[in-house]
Amino acid sequence: MKLFFSIVLLVITLDQFTKKLALTFLRDGVQSITIIADLFSLTYAENRGVAFGLEFAPPTVLLLLTGVITIMVLAYVIWSKNRTTLFLLPFALITGGGIGNMIDRVMYGKVVDFIYFDLYQGHIFGRWVSLWPIFNIADSAITIGACMLMIFHNKLFPAESPTGTTDVR
């Protein structure tokens, strides 16, 4: 469990540190710093919703929902007997990211985003779209953790075959 909580703390620390930098250098100043022209920039944005800026509930409900999900993930990891790195890492990334964004909701009433990949901006079917949202370290940790759970699902949660049956192919 030391590994789990170390990763959670690392994600929260990196997330909050980089958000503090974004607040200091991007919010009241230049708003955006181009790193790679037409591809990658640090661009300040405030997100009152969830992923991709979707607003489906008031901020208080989002905070409570995030808190409940985080507690459920923590409880699952603590009560699980699996202590492998492959099991702990994705759940630690998801937990750390969730807590990082919860801190923002409590402190600012919104989540600070600043990482932007300009993959496509333009019209699709007559409607202007920006293909990729502005996001942060916490969002990245949550996404990587969720992808790891999907990719390694069969290793993490092996299906138990009913007794007395064989796998004939």
Curated annotation (Swiss-Prot):
Location in or out of the cell: Cell inner membrane
Spans through the membrane: 59-79, 84-104, 132-152
Pathway assigned in UniProt: Protein modification; lipoprotein biosynthesis (signal peptide cleavage)
One Pfam family from the record: Peptidase_A8
One GO CC annotation: plasma membrane
Residues at the active site: 113, 139
A biological-process GO annotation: proteolysis
UniProt keyword annotation of Nucleotide-binding present: no
Role: This protein specifically catalyzes the removal of signal peptides from prolipoproteins.
Name of this protein: Lipoprotein signal peptidase
Upper taxonomic lineage: Bacteria, Pseudomonadati, Chlorobiota, Chlorobiia, Chlorobiales
GN (gene name): lspA
